[in-house]
Regions:
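Conserved AMP-binding A3 loop
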Residues: 5-29
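Short hydrophobic/charged patches on amphipathic alpha-helices used for structural packing
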Residues: 8, 82-85, 112, 134
Length: 196
């Protein structure tokens, strides 16, 4: 279980993309937690996955999650906002693995007949901005949006298990959060000089 399954490239948000070690246990635990506790993927579902399989969102949250529960998956080499809803209808995809910009592109498309009564009821991913969340959920009638936050090489992550709007959810890790002043580019402190 602790054996190395593969190396996966990080997104590069904290610097140059790098290869991160992925043990087998992390694949199993990650995909199982996402499917069962997160967006409740089952063998009756078909997932739309247009993300690269060399990144953890497309591979772990997408393909491995489907394998974990015996769900089908429609893998698209390249995302196209104009053909998305037609493909969703054609392949009856009930789940969608995303990064936030895909949701923005879909929201900026003119309404089309295929988006009405679309079968997508659940989605999982990262980067869906709060200012777009309600618009996306309401326009496309998505029941469960499971936003996650974590790094490929991290030991844990945040997950929106309770399907609350505009949140990355919770974690089971013992962590502390601090207030950050973006304008001053530093942590906020109280009158005693302690971090808030």
């Amino acid at each position: 279980a602790g054996d190395t399954a593969f190396y996966i490239f990080t997104s590069g948000t904290t610097g140059v993309p790098k290869a991160a070690l992925f043990p087998n246990v992390k694949i199993i635990a990650g995909s199982k937690n996402i499917t069962m506790a997160g967006y409740r993927l089952t063998s009756d579902d078909c997932m739309y996955n247009c993300l690269p399989l060399y990144h953890s969102t497309g591979l772990i949250l997408g393909l491995c999650a489907c394998i974990q529960v015996g769900a089908s998956t429609f893998i698209k080499r390249k995302f196209s906002a104009s053909s998305f809803w037609g493909e969703v209808q054609k392949f009856n995809t009930s789940a969608f693995v995303y990064v936030g910009e895909l949701c923005r592109y879909l929201s900026f498309q003119e309404p089309c007949d295929e988006e009405i009564n679309n079968p997508i009821s659940k989605m999982v991913g990262n980067g869906l901005r709060p200012d777009l969340w309600d618009t996306f959920r309401n326009r496309f009638n998505v029941e469960r949006i499971i936003e996650i936050y974590g790094a490929s090489e991290a030991n844990g992550m945040f997950m929106n298990l309770l399907n609350k709007d505009q949140t990355i959810g919770m974690t089971n890790l013992d962590i502390k959060l601090f207030a950050y002043d973006v304008a001053e580019d530093k942590l906020k402190v109280d009158s005693n000089g302690k971090y808030i």
